[in-house]
């Protein structure tokens, strides 16, 4: 049961401070949520340490616009049944048709047959989808009982197919969900069973929602629809309400939460329903203040004026007229002050207590103007007593409060109000006098036994005061209070203030026999059992007047009422409509509105705004509807079949029962197969013990299962790619930038560029040693001795044999194609070198004159090594001398006589498109290649003779400068080897591998011979300069030296 609105009044200072602190926390949380914003599309935003605002990537909603997954009975799909047992109303007929094709929100005034519409739709969905489930949810048990009776009585749905689920502790709920098709329950039960896996959401074809205006926030209605959306979009929703919302935003929220695709709204003035409406007379009576109320207001204004002046000076309240102080405005200003972090703590709480005192006076004005003297005295006397007790014990030191409560006007007020209350001739409020006039007139005309009256008021104290006054008058008037379950709030106890609590539990308040039933109910509250008893007595005539708070506005079948008196009014059009809708259902009714102060203007403003909203909603304006999701195939249009529904015998028992508990008991008995709960339990014990039901885990269709990284599910705000995709792209860009921007020989980690496996395999299959060799020649750089020596040592260590005279499986080259160089050692060395070098792409080369190395190599084109007779290596004339080599036949090698080394010029770093080179490589890959099998050659020892002069091969200054600038590069000091330093001589370890003491990699023997040659050449050049004239023997001596060195290389 809902709690009365009077329980929300802040009568206790501590409770009010606690609420404001909670409000402050909520406001600070809202501030923090700017960083972690929860958007309307369920995207959660988060600020990460690098100040990037991230959001969750929304999962695209699956909208099923095609055939439904529910099994359809096509034999019944060509027609839909419309009950002819009742009068056919145009608006009902039209709404039923639209409910077949849309998720529909129906807003009809009370008493116009919303339940009939729901029952007809459920009947036809049961015929069309016999294996699916239809669920009717209502917020309270009494409403569920009413809907069961109505549906079974209207449409004749067999009770054997109907289940009622009101108890979440029932153990066999899973079996009930499996066996039945139509369910009546509360939304909390459905939400719990969906989350527990007891019901498959994909089996729900129709969901009927009663009191749909509750579908806001985190209510269970919204959670059910959200859960179903995760699994399927093929379902139908029928939402019923009398008052959807008081503003456009409220209506839009319901539409969004329930996936509404069409809205059907009718008002009491709508053309198609006005002829079915009973006449309802609405009478307005404006009540003016009595002299006693005016006197109390004047005294309060005089006492609070200094406090209001202080608040105006601080700028915390704009109201300057004391009589216009409003409680809700003061409360709102207090919350803003507490939530403002820029205000110092001392100033903050000083302003807070000032506004709190002004709020107390504002509440006093409201009670005096609307409810009268007794309601005002009950409230203000408690505040006055509480302050005096705290001040006397020095628990309160607020000077502003003390000046107010100890002021002379307050003393006079307390004295005068006690005198007024004790005077029986003084009405608490003129409204009571007007109310009694209306009651006398009504019961004079109508029979006091058959006629019923409900009086609505907001506060319990006011309700009890009205009951007491009516009871004193008598005259066949039998009133009773009708309130919620909450107990009366404990008031301030002056006698126990300041004493230590013993911690004893507060027991249930005992009923006082000296007090009336209404007084005891006001103290202890009314539980559901007592509420049903009062309603039953009201229907039977034991009571003919109910004085109700908001509990009587909706959710209870109170019965037919002839007169409604609204003792006060609210600014909520929904509450006003629900109050007035309690009459004029089956016969004409009357509504009396009692207005005082500014109540009439608030009422008109609320109702006019509501009518404006209804008119625009009926025109389809101001709201955004969801897309239609059709369940019936497009080529099927069921035609109406008017049929007289025969009610099954098992449903007759429900028709004649009015008691809600009895309806629930009968429906539960049918659900359990005609057995009572005790008999069902006994039968289950005698039978075999059933296995425990395994928990089911339902998954949406085509769901992605398994683990996913968090970075794949979030993205930067404004980006369309996930963080995982951005990281991959960034990694590729970094590697490409390093390749393009680097001019050094820094190593690129292998595998740093992600390449698809298919491309790697294709590259391996198409890349040949000839292409690698050709690329290396184009690069214009010689293979370093250190690299070759390192490779050669590694090959020896792995035990690789250098005899390549075996048969090759490579394809033979085409005719007229020049033979290719087939140095396997060169190929492996160059592949290793390529892996460790970056490339700037193909650049336009510049031709460079032969270097000293080229000149030296030209002098020795063939060198025979005696111990290499078993090795055959194909070697170009221009290649660098290797540790192991042999002669090559003319068929295997074509000597390139005029080869010139290509050198990259820094002044011509212009990128070429590289098409010529790429086309040549493609041509080579597509050309069938074959190699001539190497043959053994008998070698003879012979001395190399040269014919160059003594100055050939020496560099001039320009050539030396170009050598140092073009061929030398800066190296790491740890890699530097001091060639002429005895301490850095080459050492040999146990594995016969050479290395330098200070360097990381040693030189090969051939490299050291070349270094020695260069050193001796410089010495001889120096000697020749000193002598200025060369002797004939010097060239011969130098030539002999070169011959001996080259022979040593063998």
UniProtKB/Swiss-Prot annotation:
InterPro entries: FANCM/Mph1-like_ID (IPR039686), FANCM_DEXDc (IPR044749), Helicase/UvrB_N (IPR006935), Helicase_ATP-bd (IPR014001), Helicase_C-like (IPR001650), P-loop_NTPase (IPR027417). One of its GO terms (biological process) is double-strand break repair via synthesis-dependent strand annealing. The keyword S-adenosyl-L-methionine does not apply. CDD domains: DEXDc_FANCM, FANCM_ID. It catalyses: ATP + H2O = ADP + phosphate + H(+). Residues 499-508 have a biased composition (Basic residues). ATP-dependent DNA helicase involved in DNA damage repair by homologous recombination and in genome maintenance. Capable of unwinding D-loops. Plays a role in limiting crossover recombinants during mitotic DNA double-strand break (DSB) repair. Component of a FANCM-MHF complex which promotes gene conversion at blocked replication forks, probably by reversal of the stalled fork. This is ATP-dependent DNA helicase MPH1. It comes from Scheffersomyces stipitis (strain ATCC 58785 / CBS 6054 / NBRC 10063 / NRRL Y-11545).
